[in-house]
Amino acid sequence: MCEGYVEKPLYLLIAEWMMAENRWVIAREISIHFDIEHSKAVNTLTYILSEVTEISCEVKMIPNKLEGRGCQCQRLVKVVDIDEQIYARLRNNSREKLVGVRKTPRIPAVPLTELNREQKWQMMLSKSMRR
């Protein structure tokens, strides 16, 4: 049942859900439905609207009636269309990742006792150690 969702990124799952709902949705509803933080829902909506050209959306801004919070608005979003090209692009990316993983040679680990002080610090500060 879940196999179809494993390869899809969160933004696409959210967009598909919004399109199936066929109504205006706010970030709070997304955070509740997908059990994610509100800020992550807001950031995902922003990503869908600004970066993903294959997803067509309509946007409405409704001002909050809260006093003392400045000019904050609620953003209502409705997904109109999801282009089929996005699925082809994702399939190609997943295939490339699989091919890349298989061809990547395994680099033997160097014991820490063989590294000098500078090399140890360099290793600790490298991006690969922060993952």
Swiss-Prot record:
Does the entry feature the keyword Transcription regulation, yes or no? yes
GO MF, one annotated term: DNA-binding transcription factor activity
Q: Which organism is it from?
A: Escherichia coli (strain K12)
* Swiss-Prot/TrEMBL keywords: Activator, Transcription, Transcription regulation
List GO BP terms, alphabetically.
carnitine metabolic process; DNA-templated transcription; regulation of DNA-templated transcription
For this entry, the protein name equals Transcriptional activatory protein CaiF
Phylogenetic classification of the source organism: Bacteria, Pseudomonadati, Pseudomonadota, Gammaproteobacteria, Enterobacterales
Q: Which domain of life is it from?
A: Bacteria
InterPro entries in alphabetical order: Tscrpt_reg_CaiF/GrlA, WH-like_DNA-bd_sf
Sum up the protein's function in the record's words: Potential transcriptional activator of carnitine metabolism.
